[in-house]
Amino acid sequence: MNKRTISSLIKCFVLLILLLPTWLAWDVSPAQADYILVTTPFDPAPDGCTVSHCSLREAIILANETPTTLDQIYLPTNTYHIERSGNDDTSVLGDFDITSPIEIYGIEDTPSSVVRIEGNQLDRVFEVTGSNGDLWLERVTITEGNQPLYNGGGVACYHATLTLEDVVIVLNSSPTHYGGGLAADHCTVTISNTNITNNTASDGGGIFANVSTQSLINSIVYYNHASEVGGGIYTSNSDIAFYAVTLGDNDAGTRGGGVFQIGTTSSLFIDHSLVSENHAKAEDGGGLQISEGTNLTIVNSTISANVADTFGGGISTSIPTTINHSTIVNNHADMNANNDGYGGGVLAYIGSGVTISNTILANNTDHSAFHYNDCAEYVGVDVISNGYNLVESVGNCTFNSTGDKKGLDPMLGPLQNNGGWTNTHALLIGSPAIDAGNPSVTRIQFPNSDQRGPARYARVINGQVDIGAFEAWLVTFLPVIFR
C-alpha cells in the first residue's frame, strides 16, 4: 500500500484514540515509530516520546532517526508553540528540522477548529533539508515564524521535497531575506488548497523559489508584502505553474507586485487563475514582472486591477510570452502620471515576443502622455496577434489579424464570484465578445472549460467560443403565442 492508503486506514484508529481523556499518552518506541500521536502542545527540552509525554519536537526527532522510513505525526486540535530558541539542524533548538520522510496531519475536532503551529517570533517554523527530507503538511496553520538571518520566515526547503495540502501560512516574516511565508532552494514543492497570506520579506513576500519546481493548485496567495521585489512571489531559475490560483492584493516596494521573475531558465505557466489588485509601488509590473526566462504562458485567466507606478500595469514581460483565452482589464501604468512609464495592460519589453489570441484587452489606463492604455511595445519589440482579440485601445501595438475587434467596449461585469474556482468578469448581455472567438475552437479542444474550471462551465456554448476568460451562458426566450 502507498502512504495515502496507509494514512486513510489509520485515521479511524487515531480518532478513536482522541475519544479518550485529553492528552492521553500513546506509547511510541523508536522501533515502532511509523505513527506518532503528539500529546502535548508545549515545547520542553526533548527527552524522547514516552508513555506519558510526546511533544511535536520529540516526535520529529524520533521520526528523523529513521531517515528512509516514512513516519506520520498526528496533531490534535491545539496551538503548538516553538519555545526553545537557538539554531541547530537537529530540531533540539529553534525551528523543526525535517531530514527524513515525514507526514504531519492536523486532526480538527470540528469544522471550525484549527491546528496552529507557531514560531513565537523565535525562528521559522519548519526547515526541510537533504536528499531524504520530504515533508507533507496537511490541515495545519503555520504562523508567527520569523527568520531575520536566512530565507524562509514560515517554512524553508533546501534540496528536498515539500507538499502543502489544506494549509494556511500567515503572518510570517523574513525581513532582510527572501520568502516571508515560504522559501524553496533546489526543491520540489506542491501547494494545494492552501492560503499564503500576510507574510513579509525583503523579496518574495509570500513565496521565494530558486532552482525549484513549484505547482500551485486551487490556492490563494494574497496580502503579502516585499520591501523590494516580488510582493507575492519571487522566482529565480525555477519552473512555476498556477492552476486555479488567486494571486491578489500583494505589493512590492519596487517591481513585481504579484510575481517577479528572473533567471534565464525560469518559466511561468498560469491557467484558470486570477491575478488582481497587486501593486508595484515604485517601478514595473503591477501584476507580473517577467524580466528573464524561457517562456510565460497565460491561458483561461484574468489579469485585473493591478497597478505599476512605471511600466506594465498588468504585465511587463521581457521573454517569449503566449496569452490565450484571457481577460486583461482595469490595470494601471505610470500611476504617478509623470511620464516615467507606460503600458496599462500589457508591455512587451526588451527581448520579448508576445503572441495574443482570443483575449480581451480593455479598460486599462496608461496615465502617461503616451496613453498606451491596453497594449504597448518597447522599441524593436513586436506584439503579434493570432486573431480573435477584442482590444479597446491598441496603443502602439497592431491588431489586424482575422477576427480582431478594435475600439469596442467588451461590456464586462464587475470582478466577482460568478461560480467556479476564482472570481471573474462576466460578459454582459450584448457584449461583442460573445460568440466572437476562433470558430475552430470546439468543445472537446483545450481548454475544455472557461476560467471557472469545472466541466459545467463549458468553454464553447452556442457553437462558437467567446473571446476572453469567461464563457457566457445566455438564455434564449422563445415567443409565447396566445390563441
Where would I find each of the regions flagged by the language model?
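Conserved positions at the start
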Residues: 123-125, 152, 179, 204, ...
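Leucine-rich, hydrophobic repeat-scaffold detector
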Residues: 147, 168-170, 174
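Short, solvent-exposed mixed-charge patches
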Residues: 482-483
